[in-house]
Amino acid sequence: MTLTKAEMSEYLFDKLGLSKRDAKELVELFFEEIRRALENGEQVKLSGFGNFDLRDKNQRPGRNPKTGEDIPITARRVVTFRPGQKLKSRVENASPKDE
């Protein structure tokens, strides 16, 4: 099962009594703020959850799997997520759900 933004909005609607429009806007604003911070090169720390970091990867040699031809993989910036200790602990201790 996958948790979607629509399901998050529905949860806020049910639990907090927000209108569906306000719940959807709150979820969108939350993720937009994370996107904005990362686009500006900032780290995002969510206490009790984890950190979103930016990492610069250097150019490196690669290979086309179909032709075997050597090709360079260009340098790029990637987003990484490191879960916090509380999240790690809760996930490790959670009982698995059947899908």
Curated annotation (Swiss-Prot):
Pfam families: Bac_DNA_binding. It comes from the Bacteria. GO terms for biological process: DNA recombination; positive regulation of metabolic process; regulation of DNA-templated transcription; regulation of translation. CDD domains: IHF_A. One of its GO terms (cellular component) is cytosol. Keywords: DNA recombination, DNA-binding, Transcription, Transcription regulation, Translation regulation. Residues 49-72 are annotated as: Disordered. One of its GO terms (molecular function) is structural constituent of chromatin. Belongs to the bacterial histone-like protein family. Heterodimer of an alpha and a beta chain. This is Integration host factor subunit alpha. It comes from Escherichia coli O9:H4 (strain HS). The gene is ihfA.
